[in-house]
Amino acid sequence: MSMNNIPQSTTLSDTTAGTSCFDANHIDVTTIEDLEQVGSDKWTRYPGCIGAFIAEMDYGLAPCVAEAIEEATERGALGYIPDPWKKEVARSCAAWQRRYGWEVDPTCIRPVPDVLEAFEVFLREIVRAGNSIVVPTPAYMPFLSVPRLYGVEVLEIPMLCAGAGESSGRNDEWLFDFDAIEQAFANGCHAFVLCNPHNPIGKVLTREEMLRLSDLAAKYDVRIFSDEIHAPFVYQGHTHVPFASINRQTAMQAFTSTSASKSFNIPGTKCAQVILTNPDDLELWMRNAEWSEHQTATIGAIATTAAYDGGAAWFEGVMAYIERNIALVNEQMRTRFAKVRYVEPQGTYIAWLDFSPLGIGDPANYFFKKANVALTDGRECGEVGRGCVRMNFAMPYPLLEECFDRMAVALEADGLL
């Protein structure tokens, strides 16, 4: 291999690890027009609308990531992903997992274009056509649609909202319906989707909840697909615990996938990771998932390694900004939008808003037409999503204020607030 193709991540991390370079003031003055000029789907699909549907942030790139991408393009490192970069991704991902107290063997980590590709391998190779999978709802939309492409039946099991009433409640909490889950397992379902932190409700599971799930899985020989892409986005009072890290039983049950794409806003670079703590899964992966690795982008491996190695300080700046935003969301839902059902997220940068108490059957369409706000239709997240929307609040703070203003004006005009 030539010198130009040897990973340069160590040098990059040495120069960037100690500086944040996250400029909140710059984010605050970013306009809709500025974001449309960037050209993302989030801000160009519906011109003039506030984009609050696609789950990506509007905070630019960490300097270490931008520098790594620039250097890679200058030296023409845009070919198929070579083994040295696969190993760098594994090494840096394993190092990042230590944030959660998880010591992972890098040889268990393989590159994949995105978490959904990992999910597809799980469906194809482990669940297999003719079987079923439990998906707690509301759910990330593809978890409901993709299994059917592989002949796998989706069993929607609605989450329970403990303490939910007609208005927001700071003590409300989302819970798994373990009785319904066990019934599904007893009836022959052998797979479960665990999204933690959960998209779209923002729940962060406790160790005790995951142990209860694991014990049920052990009783009925169930495998767990663990999507942990939102792991860094956890608010004060809550802790992300990787499912596979708890004990040997969970490690053998888990098929974990994660990525730097949410934390560092690089989903378009196409590099996620699958963490295979069950040796049989690793053997299966090496035998049957070669083309999934082959589709992983070299530029994504470079960006991911730079992010994991050198982006921690920048990400802390991002989290401080998002915590300011979630404080605004919580305040708005307690005051102007008190009639809307809402449970404060424990993690992620996504809020789940239930407008059914206001008699709005299709709030996504309502706010798109009456407020120029683009939200995700809750029905895409499962049967329980009727009357609900998913809101991405990882945008400039002033635009988030404007988003709520637009929505409130529309509702007030119709006498609904």
Specify the residue positions occupied by each region the protein language model found.
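Conserved core segment of the aminotransferase class I/II
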Residues: 4-13, 248-323, 331-332, 409-411
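Conserved glycine-rich beta-strand-loop-beta hairpin in the small C-terminal domain of fold type I
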Residues: 305, 321-330, 342-354
